């Protein structure tokens, strides 16, 4: 049983390290809720309205 707890703790530790803590999912969802698209560069004629993916991409509309 103790081995099971240690295995569970190790898996949870690895999982928590993989989850971004800077709110990047929230910014991406907020962009899509505003009918925008996350892109590296906005196309000609599109307007930059925010950031996505932890400020690595632009939210274009």
From Swiss-Prot:
Gene Ontology cellular component annotations, sorted alphabetically: extracellular space
Positions of a 1,2-diacyl-sn-glycero-3-phosphate 2 binding: 40, 51, 58
Consequence when changing residue 56 to A: Modest, but significant reduction in fungal growth inhibition activity. No effect on permeabilization of C.albicans cell membranes
MF GO annotations: CCR6 chemokine receptor binding; chemoattractant activity; identical protein binding; phosphatidic acid binding
Domain of life per record: Eukaryota
InterPro entries linked to this entry: Defensin_beta-like
Main location: secreted
Keyword Cell inner membrane among record annotations: no
UniProt similarity note: Belongs to the beta-defensin family.
Note: Despite modest sequence identity to mammalian defensins, shows significant structural similarity to human BD-2/defensin beta 4A.
Described function: Exhibits antimicrobial activity against fungi. Antimicrobial activity in a pH-dependent manner against the yeast C.albicans; activity is salt tolerant and retains antifungal activity in NaCl concentrations of 100mM. Permeabilizes C.albicans cell membranes via targeting plasma membrane phospholipid phosphatidic acid.
Protein name, entry field: Beta-defensin 13
Organism of provenance: Crocodylus porosus
């Amino acid at each position: 049983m103790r081995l099971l707890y240690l295995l569970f703790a190790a898996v949870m530790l690895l999982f928590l390290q993989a989850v971004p803590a800077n709110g990047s999912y929230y910014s991406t969802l907020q962009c899509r809720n505003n009918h925008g698209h996350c892109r590296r560069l906005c196309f000609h004629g599109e307007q930059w309205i925010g950031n996505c993916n932890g400020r690595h991409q632009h939210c274009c509309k």
